[in-house]
């Protein structure tokens, strides 16, 4: 965060990197993590930060590109060792429609010994554009929402491994119903997509409806 109270930093490059790594590690479990890198000028960094905020609150804004890949099951322990990946256990439940233009879901997320709960709503406009809003909720509200669950869909359990390399953010979703495959998400600006070493990509599934979360809730397979 930028403010006028920060002291000047005079540490070596190595120490600066160590501090930045610790900061990223501390925030890596946050459900709305965005990495604003130093590859652009200060003004562009501010613009990227503003765009990230708009994205989080569900307002139309230029969003980072998002690519999705079907991958061979990675060595999750190696992800932690090699990339300092943070593992987050999640359970996502889709709710019955009350508005045909609004998809609703709730998520239970385990952070260490604590559980967090979120309500998410994805709305689609008549022009085809959509935005997503998400807010934290109490355990009591979460349980109440579960009573509105879509009975035609399964709850989706997964462990999400989050890490960053350079200006890009990576997420790997591992599901209990698949022992051989997982899903890799790559977030970042630009068309070129650098994939982490040690990850075997089977194919890109960015626009494949079969690998959307709602489809996985229906078929429970990769």
PLM features: residue spans?
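Short, well-ordered coil/turn elements that cap or connect secondary structure elements
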Residues: 28-30, 206
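A glycine- and Lys/Arg-enriched "phosphate-lid" helix/loop adjacent to the NTP-binding pocket
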Residues: 1-26
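Long, hydrophilic "mature protein body" segments
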Residues: 21, 30, 36-37, 61-62, ...
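Short amphipathic alpha-helical segments, especially helix-boundary/capping motifs
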Residues: 26-27, 122
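Phosphate-end processing signature that detects enzymes handling 5′-triphosphorylated RNA
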Residues: 43, 51-222
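Phosphate-binding beta-loop-alpha motif at adenosine-nucleotide cofactor sites
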Residues: 30-48
């Amino acid at each position: 965060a930028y403010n006028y109270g920060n002291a000047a930093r005079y540490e070596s490059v190595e120490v600066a990197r160590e501090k930045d790594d610790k900061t990223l590690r501390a925030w890596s479990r946050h459900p709305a993590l965005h990495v604003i890198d130093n590859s652009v000028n200060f003004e562009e960094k501010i613009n990227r930060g503003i765009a990230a905020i708009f994205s989080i609150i569900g307002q139309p804004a230029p969003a980072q590109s998002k690519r999705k890949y079907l991958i061979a099951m990675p060595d999750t322990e190696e992800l932690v060792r090699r990339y300092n990946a943070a593992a987050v256990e999640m359970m996502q439940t889709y709710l019955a429609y009350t508005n045909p233009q609004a998809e609703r879901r709730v998520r239970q997320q385990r952070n260490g010994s604590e559980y967090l709960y979120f309500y998410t709503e994805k709305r689609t406009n008549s022009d085809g554009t959509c935005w997503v809003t998400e807010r934290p909720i109490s355990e009591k509200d979460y349980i109440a929402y579960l009573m509105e669950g879509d009975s035609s869909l399964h709850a989706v359990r997964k462990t999400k491994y989050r890490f960053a390399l350079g200006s890009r953010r990576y997420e790997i979703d591992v599901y209990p119903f698949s022992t051989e495959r997982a899903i890799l998400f790559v977030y970042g600006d630009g068309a070129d997509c650098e994939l982490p070493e040690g990850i075997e990509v089977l194919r890109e599934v960015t626009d494949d409806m079969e690998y959307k979360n709602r489809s996985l809730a229906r078929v429970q397979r990769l």
